[in-house]
């Protein structure tokens, strides 16, 4: 991943549009939690989206705009993530331009680690994605917390494909 100033420069120039066609302003005064997922078919990602959905009201009351980014087509993102209404904005990044722009890493060993050590969670996620969840990349997730001026307050890079920023760290962001 890039250094903080490079990330700030990159995200301040991002022109994000969610899967419903709504523009997502960055640096206009709202705190933003960019939760950068793998594919929409990722079993672990589907579980995390469910957890975020359960906690979203708390975060939204604190004036945090949550933006979930998926390295998937809009149709896959709608089918696997947005089949139920989500209380946050969802961005499809099918060509992985955001991932490349942030220099996020991939790791087969980190994927294998999650599969071996998080088997119950994997099986739970597969119940949501079906067999499509078995064919995913080695891309690792990341979370970036931005203040209202697009200044990076926290970067969390995943240790494996099931890993995301702990909710307790997002609490400190409030």
Give the residues covered by each predicted segment.
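N-terminal "domain-start" segment that seeds a small globular fold
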Residues: 1-27
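Short loop/turn microsegments at loop-to-beta-strand junctions
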Residues: 11-12, 31-33, 140-142
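Short active-site neighborhood of thiol/selenol oxidoreductases, capturing the structured segment around
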Residues: 25-52
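Short beta-strand/turn micro-motifs composed of small residues
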Residues: 37, 70, 147
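Structural microenvironment flanking redox-active thiols in thiol-disulfide oxidoreductases
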Residues: 48-101
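Thiol/selenol-based redox catalytic cores and closely related redox-interacting motifs
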Residues: 93-162
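A short, polar/charged loop-to-alpha-helix boundary motif
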Residues: 161-174
